[in-house]
A protein has these predicted regions:
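Catalytic-core "active-site belt" of small-molecule-metabolizing enzymes
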Residues: 2-204, 245, 253-261
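Juxtamembrane/interface motifs at transmembrane-helix termini
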Residues: 215, 244-246
Length: 261
């Protein structure tokens, strides 16, 4: 376990890395005893510093929701990070590629809450009842920590690699479609790069949301009405570069397009 002074130093280092767009050396290489709970402590302090600087928390992202990704990272549960107001973009936008370090894109669904959600004991039925609508979303992954050799402990401290999100397509009520069967085709520059179905997110994307409610309850937190929850990716991360146009076709749920400038 890390002491409070070290946790504060890491949070400050990550704030500076985001400001300068310069990744820091891997935390687990420098602090081999660092734990997942240490990482969440860093993330919570980092979030508080951002809120003190004027950013507004509008939701959470859930990561590492697929069994393949969990096996690859040697963990048995997802992770989560904060979404701030200035991270939420709309389809058709131009994204400043230079704003991010190692940007990648994933295909997801976002849940927008009409009621508060609080654990422990939150179930998938609580999530569906508390959801106003579900809408297609792309997540733009960022990294303030060097990529090579990075572990879940590094990623959690780095706000679960959250960079931004792009929302678009057609909002639907959570009971209007079978969310497990929502699918998407991800294009880069008119070439199909990835395809996926939302059942790849813990068998149902709402399962990630109730996991989140129960997990953050252990950290003394909860979700409020109006929060946006990125439920987890059902494609592999797609590397993007300056000049790339990304398009995600969700079929009946519409599409999302953005260009990296």
């Amino acid at each position: 376990m890390l002491d409070a002074k070290t946790i504060e130093a890491i949070a400050d280092e990550l704030l500076e890395a985001a400001r300068t767009r310069t990744p820091v050396p891997r935390l687990t290489a420098r602090y081999p005893g660092m734990t997942v709970e240490d990482s969440y402590a860093v993330q919570q302090l980092w979030r508080r510093r951002n809120e003190e600087a004027g950013r507004t928390l509008v939701g959470r992202k859930i990561g590492l929701t697929s069994k393949a990704m969990q096996a690859a990272t040697g963990i048995t549960e997802p992770d989560y990070g904060a979404i701030f107001d200035d991270m939420v973009l709309e389809t058709g936008c131009s994204v400043a590629w230079d704003k991010y370090t190692h940007p990648r894109v994933e295909v997801e669904l976002a849940f927008v809450l009409k009621d508060a959600l609080k654990g422990p004991g939150c179930t998938i039925f609580d999530v569906l009842n508390a959801t106003d609508y579900v809408v297609p979303a792309l997540e733009i992954l960022d990294s303030r920590i060097e990529m090579e050799g990075r572990t879940i402990v590094d990623t959690i401290a780095d706000n679960a690699a959250m960079g931004a999100m792009v929302v678009g397509g057609n909002p639907v009520r959570p009971d209007a479609v079978d969310l497990r069967w929502v699918s998407a085709i991800l294009y880069k520059n008119q070439t199909v790069e990835e395809t996926g179905v939302a059942a790849g997110v813990l068998d149902h994307p709402a399962n990630g949301v109730h996991w989140l409610a129960n997990k953050i309850a252990a950290h003394g937190d909860s979700m409020k009405a109006g929060d946006i929850i990125l439920a987890g990716s059902f494609t592999r991360p797609l590397w993007v570069y300056k000049g790339d146009t990304v398009h995600a076709d969700y079929g009946p749920l519409g599409s999302i397009t953005c260009r990296f400038e």
